[in-house]
């Protein structure tokens, strides 16, 4: 950051992903392109069009403050959102700064790593035009389908039997009269009639029951097409680049779609030999149809998407009654189970985002004005970032979730405006064997956000959607339930930075930097702090004693240390808010205002902390870069450890203060890890080459202190000596069996009601009582190892690529299987007297819940290796193409998300954290003129 260095002179830990690697496969955003390409960078995916996953660089260091990295696009730090709005084909390179010696120059904003995005710029030469485009067809693949209608009916029979075996037959002994009770209780005559089809011949035949594939109703073949046209050219004094892009991503779930338009332009002008100026603009307009919305439902705990809503409906339910009317609540009164027929047209969540990001600079080279000042330059740069976001939600009264009550609408907007102004002085000079670089920086930035939201029920006309909120009477709360809110937030950051880069004889390297940051979000007297860093490098390959070792091309040792800060709390965390409300005065309501003290407000508020300061991380990094056998083997390895102090935590305080909690600088964590990047060329002949890249990372974090010193915070599952994110609860030891009768009796004597087929919790203290004293740390939510592996095979223009990624050594909570007998159920192996080796407990019909410990079986050890992409392309011979005016041409086909080579949980896609994923095939074209 803030300058350019030769790779051989870099002393910090960083990784670079170039445009060629980024474009090995077409992606919707740069997050997808980065996955598995850089050691120490863990990226989760999202299949919803227009939605990105999350990214972590070297794990978590903070407990409650943000762990998101800083994004810098063409020198401009982004204050809102990430890089999802940027066209990946406009990106020249992505540099990831990982250690404190690299990120400390960004001060407070670099605590969680820095991602530098450099977009493409014009190059001197003839005008070059390029087109890139692709079409992708995707289908949803479910690793955990719902039970068929027949299987579900049998399963419910078992649930009734297990709830009352005296009065109900076994599940494998069908009884017509009992079925009339089991399936009439739901209150859906059509569903009962469907069940009775199985009794049409007087004996039970489950194959005659209509099996409704609800999931198939809401899915479709998703079609994505993206196109980018770009041009570049110029001469020695002026270079320009432009790009226009279009993306349309239709989801595999009906109602989900994302459309994005991109425009990018840059100009660089050598106005005078001593003055250069330029700028770039990156604009985007995106429209996301988020899909099925649960906003405005009577319960906020409904399904997260329409596919989940469909899977919640038992398959013995049917969509229509005998008269062809849609059945709103298939299978009856089951909570939060509604039809999905045409719901994608009755539940709208439309989100629009406009973003314009600029980067403008002017640079003076004083050495060109006066020779004695050779190497001295001054650069001023200004980067504005504007983002406007609008969300419109409309749920028709005819939708299943509104149950014919009232139309619901919501309209919300967010406007973000930020800017960064940098004044930078650089001095670079070589004195014999000494190479010196000095950078001085003064930087100021400001962030402002305005937001507004309004919602109401009983919108009189569906055509209004969210565009006529004034059509409701806001004073009639009972009828319209109208609500509105507005808000504004802003913060500022001022910084001063100095850095020295020194190299002696191209062998011994030194980088020293210091940054002084002041953040407006912290308390007076604590706003400013200093963040130093230093790094050493030794290019062993340049030593005289290495000259005769021809197989070593590069060998460099690195050591770095530095301190970074984190002030990622809300803008007014150190201040008390003013609360507004209405009080009766005579016959009218009069507005009144009070501080946020709980004496005046009913809500729980935090006590203002006028001493809130910086969260600081000190990191040490030990690294080696190497290249052997003329580059056939190359890579880097880094070992790091860090300590984070003065954590920004919500701390419980005595209630005699009138408050329950406050933000404070308390607690410590530490972090240790290893990053490995290995590039191999196992085979290289005249016509054939096989290249392989492996990126692996190990990471472990640990809590050292909390708000109350060395005392655990059990309510938040924070434990001294353990990872920041763990699962804490009761362990299970499989299922109780008939042979455990004597052991069960000891527990049941203390009030438990264990039976054969139920979950067997582990009694840690051996007192035959399962309570809070039996809870333990079950596992870590974050992976210990993250892996990326890509292989490319080239033969005379034919190119085959395979990409894999994986995570290892962590735990997921799959939720277990409640098996209450009334909700839908995925296909599982459940306990019966004839299936005692089942994976899950026996079903027990209950409106209040079946087996109280069913969730314990949801905790699973997680590890996977996923085949992310297989591509086959052909690069046409450039000599033959010149005859028809084409400089380059590539055709390719790709398969996306083929499946897993290994997964410890067979019914989940552990990469996504869901039971379903999209598998697709892409056909693409790249052509240059």
What residue spans do the PLM features occupy?
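Short loop/turn motifs that connect adjacent beta-strands in outer-membrane beta-barrel proteins
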Residues: 122-127, 236-237, 274-277, 367-376, ...
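Short, small/polar-rich motifs associated with maturation and membrane association
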Residues: 1-264, 272, 276-278, 282-284, ...
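Extracytoplasmic gating/loop element in the C-terminal half of outer-membrane beta-barrel translocons
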Residues: 202-203, 333-342, 477, 519, ...
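Flexible loop and strand-edge segments within Gram-negative outer membrane beta-barrel domains
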Residues: 140-142, 204-245, 249-256, 262-337, ...
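Small-side-chain secondary-structure face that scaffolds active or pore-lining regions
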Residues: 251-262, 268-270, 282-284, 288-296, ...
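Outer-membrane beta-barrel signature, preferentially recognizing the C-terminal barrel domain
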Residues: 345-347, 475-497, 586-634, 662-685, ...
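Outer-membrane beta-barrel transmembrane strands
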Residues: 220-236, 245-247, 340-391, 411-430, ...
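Surface-exposed loop/turn segments flanking beta-strands in extracellular/periplasmic regions
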Residues: 152-165, 184-209, 298-342, 395-409, ...
């Amino acid at each position: 950051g803030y300058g350019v260095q030769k790779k051989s002179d870099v002393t910090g830990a960083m990784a670079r992903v170039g445009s060629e690697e980024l474009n090995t496969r077409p992606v919707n955003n740069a997050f997808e392109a980065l996955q598995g390409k850089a050691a120490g960078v863990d990226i989760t995916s999202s299949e919803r069009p227009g939605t990105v996953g999350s990214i972590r660089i070297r794990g978590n260091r903070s407990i409650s403050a943000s762990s998101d990295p800083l994004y810098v696009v063409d020198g401009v730090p982004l204050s809102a959102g990430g890089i999802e709005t940027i066209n990946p084909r406009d990106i020249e390179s992505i540099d990831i700064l990982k250690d404190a010696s690299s990120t400390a120059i960004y001060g407070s904003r670099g605590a969680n790593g820095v991602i530098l995005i450099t977009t493409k710029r014009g190059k001197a030469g003839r005008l070059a035009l390029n087109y890139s485009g692709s079409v992708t067809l995707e289908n949803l693949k479910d690793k955990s389908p719902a039970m068929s209608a027949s299987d579900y009916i049998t399963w419910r029979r078992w649930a009734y039997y297990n709830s009352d075996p005296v009065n109900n037959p076994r599940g494998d002994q069908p009884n017509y009269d009992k079925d009339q009770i089991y399936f009439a209780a739901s209150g859906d005559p059509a569903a009962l009639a469907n069940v009775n089809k199985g009794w049409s011949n007087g004996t039970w035949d489950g194959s005659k029951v209509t099996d409704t594939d609800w999931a198939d109703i809401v899915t479709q073949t998703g079609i994505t097409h993206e196109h980018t046209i770009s041009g570049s050219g110029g001469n020695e004094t002026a270079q320009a680049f432009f790009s226009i892009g279009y993306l349309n991503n239709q989801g595999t779930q009906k109602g989900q779609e994302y459309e994005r338009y991109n425009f990018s332009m840059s100009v660089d002008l050598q106005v005078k030999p001593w003055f250069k100026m330029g700028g770039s603009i990156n604009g985007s307009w995106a429209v996301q149809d988020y899909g099925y919305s649960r906003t405005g439902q009577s319960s906020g705990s409904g399904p997260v998407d329409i596919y989940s809503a469909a899977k919640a409906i038992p398959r013995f339910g049917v969509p229509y009654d005998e008269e062809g009317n849609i059945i709103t609540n298939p299978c009856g009164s089951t909570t939060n189970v509604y039809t999905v027929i045409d719901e994608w047209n009755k539940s709208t969540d439309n989100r629009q985002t406009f973003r314009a990001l600029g980067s403008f600079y002017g640079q003076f080279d004083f050495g060109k004005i006066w020779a004695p000042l050779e190497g001295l330059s001054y650069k001023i740069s200004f980067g504005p970032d504007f983002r406007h976001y609008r969300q419109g939600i409309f749920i028709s009264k005819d939708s299943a979730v509104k149950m014919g009550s009232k139309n619901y609408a919501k309209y919300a907007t967010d406007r973000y405006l930020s800017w960064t102004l940098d004044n930078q002085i650089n001095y670079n000079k070589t004195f014999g064997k000494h190479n010196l670089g000095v950078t001085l920086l003064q930087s100021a930035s400001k962030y402002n956000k305005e937001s507004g939201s309004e919602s109401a029920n009983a919108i009189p006309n569906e055509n209004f959607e969210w565009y006529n909120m004034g059509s409701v009477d806001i004073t009639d709360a009972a009828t319209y339930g109208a609500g509105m809110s507005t808000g504004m937030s802003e913060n500022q950051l001022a910084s001063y930075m100095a850095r020295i880069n020194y190299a002696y004889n191209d062998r011994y390297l030194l980088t020293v930097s210091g940054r002084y940051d002041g953040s407006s979000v912290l308390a007076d007297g604590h706003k400013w702090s200093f963040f130093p860093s230093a790094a050493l490098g030794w290019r062993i390959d340049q030593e005289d004693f290495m000259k005769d070792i021809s197989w070593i091309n590069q060998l460099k040792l690195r050591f770095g240390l530095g301190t970074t800060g984190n002030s990622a709390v809300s803008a007014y965390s150190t201040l008390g808010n003013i609360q507004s409300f209405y009080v009766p005065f005579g016959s009218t309501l009069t507005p009144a205002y009070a501080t946020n003290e709980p004496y005046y407000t009913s809500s729980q508020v935090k006590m203002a902390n006028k001493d809130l300061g910086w969260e600081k991380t000190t990191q040490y990094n030990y690294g080696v870069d190497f290249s052997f056998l003329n580059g056939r083997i190359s890579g880097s390895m880094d070992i790091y450890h860090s300590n984070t102090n003065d954590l920004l935590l919500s701390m419980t305080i005595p209630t005699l203060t009138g408050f329950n909690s406050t933000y404070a600088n308390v607690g410590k964590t530490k972090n240790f890890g290893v990053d490995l990047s290995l590039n191999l060329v196992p085979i290289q002949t005249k016509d054939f080459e096989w290249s392989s890249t492996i990126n692996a990372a190990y990471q472990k974090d640990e809590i050292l202190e909390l708000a109350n010193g060395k005392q655990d915070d059990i309510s938040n599952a924070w434990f001294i000596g353990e990872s920041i994110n763990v699962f804490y609860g009761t362990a299970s030891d499989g299922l109780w069996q008939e042979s455990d009768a004597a052991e069960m009796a000891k527990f049941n004597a203390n009030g438990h009601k264990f039976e054969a087929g139920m979950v067997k919790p582990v009694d840690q203290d051996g007192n035959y009582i399962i309570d809070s004293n039996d809870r333990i740390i079950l596992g870590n939510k974050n992976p210990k190892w993250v892996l990326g592996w890509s292989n490319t095979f080239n033969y005379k223009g034919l190119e085959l690529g395979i990409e894999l990624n994986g995570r290892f050594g962590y735990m997921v909570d799959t939720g277990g299987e409640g098996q209450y007998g009334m909700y839908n159920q995925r296909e599982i192996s459940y306990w019966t007297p004839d299936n005692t080796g089942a994976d899950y407990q026996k079903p027990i019909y209950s409106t209040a819940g079946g087996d109280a410990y069913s969730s314990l079986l949801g905790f699973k050890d997680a590890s996977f290796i996923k085949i992310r992409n297989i591509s086959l392309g052909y690069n046409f011979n450039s000599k033959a193409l010149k005859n028809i005016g084409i400089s380059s041409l590539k055709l390719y086909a790709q398969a996306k998300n083929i499946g897993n080579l290994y997964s410890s949980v067979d019914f989940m896609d552990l990469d996504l954290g869901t039971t379903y994923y999209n598998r697709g095939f892409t056909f693409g074209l790249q052509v240059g003129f």
